[in-house]
């Protein structure tokens, strides 16, 4: 019997993940997609890409049976808030989704609720926290450590022995050279090249990437 599953977030990432689920035969053999859950009032009961928005977070918090959930929110802080809130309902199982063409060794350790989109390559001896999102065409090199709630936007390349702290977001097309540390709650602007360590709670942009503001 298939497991019921909802996609939290009917925005861009949620719709992309729906598509990637629909073309993943192995995933569909295990899961039955019920629809979307979204906190946007205007979307409730509407159809989004062929699936209904069946409820909001309040509805899901009170769901009375086991239900698998993939949180599809690109913003790391929003994803963390939703995950912490939904964790109160022990019926919710936070599911990891791995697209069918992702390359990831069995020994790579990753936490619950992660997303690995089309064409990602995760190499060896890597540790990944909970609820991390790897958008399409990202690569992560050997011995890297990716924290909880990290977002890698499309085409990010992480070299070996890189550490990325919790709730950091790495912008589209960013490259990070080997043995660099990126702190917690960091935003790296699109197209940046990280060649030095980046401190926590800042926005860094450019080639090379440098902090432009702290938050």
Feature annotation, model-predicted:
Residues 2-21:
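Glycine-rich adenosine-cofactor-binding loop
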Residues 4-5, 32-34, 66-70, 184:
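Short active-site oxyanion
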Residues 13, 42, 210:
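Conserved Rossmann-like nucleotide-cofactor binding loop
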Residues 25-30, 88-92:
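Short helix-capping segments at alpha-helix termini
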Residues 26-46:
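NAD(P)-binding Rossmann-fold cofactor-contacting core
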Residues 41-103:
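Phosphate-bearing ligand-interacting subdomains
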Residues 96-205, 209-212:
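Structural signal for interior beta-strand "rungs" in well-ordered beta-sheet cores
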């Amino acid at each position: 019997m298939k497991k019921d599953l909802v996609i939290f977030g009917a925005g861009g990432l949620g719709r992309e993940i729906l598509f990637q689920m629909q073309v993943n035969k192995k995933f569909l053999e295990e899961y039955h997609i019920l629809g979307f859950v979204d906190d946007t009032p205007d979307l409730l009961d509407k159809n989004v890409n062929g699936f209904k928005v069946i409820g909001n977070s309040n509805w899901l918090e009170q769901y009375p049976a086991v239900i698998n959930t993939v949180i599809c929110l690109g913003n790391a802080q929003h994803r963390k808030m939703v995950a912490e809130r939904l964790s109160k309902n022990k019926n919710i199982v936070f599911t990891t989704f791995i697209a069918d063409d992702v390359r990831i060794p069995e020994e790579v350790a990753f936490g619950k609720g992660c997303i690995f989109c089309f064409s990602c390559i995760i190499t060896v001896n890597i540790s990944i926290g909970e609820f991390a999102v790897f958008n399409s065409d990202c690569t992560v090199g050997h011995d890297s450590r990716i924290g909880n709630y990290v977002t890698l936007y499309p085409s990010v390349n992480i070299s070996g022995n890189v550490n990325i702290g919790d709730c950091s977001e790495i912008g589209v097309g960013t490259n990070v050279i080997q043995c660099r540390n990126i702190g917690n709650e960091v935003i790296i602007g699109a197209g940046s090249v990280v060649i030095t360590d980046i401190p926590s709670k800042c926005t860094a942009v450019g080639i090379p990437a440098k902090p432009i503001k702290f938050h």
